[in-house]
Structure formats: C-alpha cells, structure tokens
Amino acid sequence: MNQPRTRGPIARLFIGLWDAVNFSRRLVFNLLFLLVVFVLLAAMLGGGKLAPLAERSTLVIAPEGRLVEQYSCDPVSRAFARATNGNDCREIRLRDVLRALDAARTDKRIERVVLHLDELQPSGFASLRDVATAIGRVKAAGKQVIAYGDNYSQGQYVLAAQANHVYLDPMSQGGVMLEGLAGYRQYFRQGLQDKLGIDMHLFKVGEYKSAAEPYILDAASAESKEADLFWMNDLWQRMLADIGRARGLDPAALAANIEAMDAQVAGANGDLAQLALKQKPVDGQKTREQVEDLLLEKGVADDTAEGGFRQVALDTYVQHLDGALPQADVRPQAAVAVAAGEIA
C-alpha cells in the first residue's frame, strides 16, 4: 500500500505563502465590495433629515450631465454614478430645475442664483430654452443671477446669457463657443454598390423623404438640404434672438461675429476670453476664488460651506420643495409617458 507523499519544508513554505496571498486577495476584494455597498447606501439615503434652509441663501445650480424629461437609469445606477463620479447616468431632470427656479423666484430665503455650467452636457434646445426662460423670470423678479465658468459651449451659454453677470475664468483660456447648427450624415452608396455589388431599390412618396438617402446617394439631395436648412435656420434665429434679448446685443451683429470667427480670433491673438469680453457675451473675467469672494461679499459667510458663503445646492433645494408638498392626491391621475430615441 502506497504511503501518502510527505511534502518537504520548502514545499510547505510556498504552500503557506500561497494560502496567505489567496486569503489576502479574498479579504481585500470583500472589503472593497463592502465599501461599494456602503457608499451606495449612503448616496441613496442622502444623509437623513434635511437641515432647515437658512435665510439669505444662494441657490447654486451646477448641473452635471444632460437635461432630460425623465431619468433613463434606475436609482441605484444614478447613485453609483454620483458616488464614483462616472459619466454613465449623468442626467438632470428638467422639471426639477424648473421647479427650483420658479420656487426661488418667490422664496424669501433665496437671495440670488448662481449658475456654474461647466459640467452641463449637450441637451435639447427646447429644454435649454425652458430653463433659460425660467432663469429670466428669476431675474425679472429682482433677484440677482450670476453665471461663471471656465468655458461656455453653445448650450451652456444659452442659459448663462440670462444672468445679470456672466464671468469667464481667465486662467482657463476658455471662451464662448457659439458656432451655429449643423447636421452630419454618413452615405453608403459607394461602399454598398461599387465595392460590395449590392443594388439598392428605394420606393418613396414625397420629395422630402430623406431617411433612406444614405443607401442610394453619395451626398445629401437638394431637397434634404432645403428641409434641414429650414428647421436649422429657424432654430438658430430663435437662439440668436434669445441671446441678443438677454444680453442687449443685436442678433444680426452677433451672427456676423460668429460668421467671421476665424478672423476675430486671429485679431485677438487667439485669446478667446478677451474676444468674448470685447464682443460683450461676457461681463468680465474672474477666477473661481474671485467669484466666491464676490458672493461672500454680497451674501452671508458660512465657514462650513464650499466657497465660504451660505448656499444651497439644486438637489438639496428640490428635497426641501418635496418636503413641503401636500400629501399625494388619491384621486385618479393622468400619467405622462416620456418617449425618447428612435422608433425601430
């Protein structure tokens, strides 16, 4: 009968080391898992009871993500994205922003509104226009609105233009990037027919039906260009009119400056911030610290708050508004279904 093989001391040493490494690996991964669970729970619970909203507070609106009618992610995914600073599920519900702005207009506890739009991602013009109109109502009610940022994209500036004062950070070398509207589409006829030998047969009714053009043409048809220019020009003129009205600028002069942007930038030696200051889309150049000093001077000091001035974030203010709502109406309600994306 064979005797069990006895391991030598060196083998037992390496086996022991491997067991220790394996145990450490499992311990570290389990601790990381527990940490993630703890962070998710903390993010979802939101820290418990809200502190009362103090008088003379500044409402800080710093959206991170794009404006949407309805969240596309579940609460757990949104909480995880916030906790890990991820790009997925970064969305701001449009009605929350509108509710906050409309409430701040008459809320005596809110002294002013600050817009920090650096993290606002491209959003639909209809949503941007709704928010811009709400900002205008706050300003019309006599409350100061201040916008500041490192750089303003076209969508971000649609909102910033409504502020009483618009500032650019001189350290960021950013500017106001108004560039108009454009549409891009890929065309596949050459690849399908000439290279793959696929013959496409398209039957359509109406000259302006262009959805299937990429399969039979190498470029947009005249009718497709005409249709796109029709809605793009209309949208662009509305955007210029809104910006011009808010900033006291002539929309035609604004459009002319954008058309000659290359020459304008060259004339400013590539300094986009100075160009924006010269053309009046912004009121001045201030660093983040200078803006915070300005808000501290006009507001109330708070050593526990970021920037040192008394403030309330958008999410927190919406929670205050939710807490003040009456009990749910038990009568039958009309549900609104939000549809987004392509119909396939």
Please report, for each region that a protein language model flagged, where it lies by residue.
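Small-residue-centered hinge/linker elements
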Residues: N2-V265, E292, L296-A344
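Short acidic-hydrophobic, aromatic-tinged amphipathic segments that line or gate anion-handling sites
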Residues: V166-L168, V282-R288
